[in-house]
Amino acid sequence: MAHKKGVGSSRNGRDSDGQRLGCKKFGGEAVKAGNIIYRQHGTKIHPGNNVGLGKDYTLFALIEGVVKFERMGKDRKKVSVYPAN
């Protein structure tokens, strides 16, 4: 006979870290060319003027300027960068 009681093991107890998605630069904030503005899965927010779209759908500034979030029609959003005056 076993001299220790058999102890079951749980198959839970794991969780992956978050992916740090979301807004990195907010409306009205100054950005330099190459600064990441928004990290996302899919085009939740579309690229507007002077904003590039990375292969993982990251939005980034193409010029130095100020961030502005805008609406595209009824249900879509875009982010643009306009030169600071």
UniProtKB/Swiss-Prot annotation:
- Which family, according to UniProt? Belongs to the bacterial ribosomal protein bL27 family.
Q: What is the superkingdom listed in this entry's lineage?
A: Bacteria
| GO cellular component, as recorded | cytosolic large ribosomal subunit
Q: Is Ion transport there in the keyword field? A: no
The record's region (Disordered) falls at: 1-21
- Signal sequence residues: none
Keyword Ribonucleoprotein appears in the UniProt entry: yes
| Species per Swiss-Prot/TrEMBL record | Citrifermentans bemidjiense (strain ATCC BAA-1014 / DSM 16622 / JCM 12645 / Bem) (Geobacter bemidjiensis)
What is the name of the protein in this document? Large ribosomal subunit protein bL27
GO terms classed as biological process: translation
Q: Which UniProt keywords apply?
A: Ribonucleoprotein, Ribosomal protein
Pfam families in UniProt: Ribosomal_L27
Q: Which gene encodes it?
A: rpmA
Q: InterPro entries in the record, alphabetically?
A: Ribosomal_bL27 (IPR001684)
Q: Which GO terms describe its molecular function?
A: structural constituent of ribosome
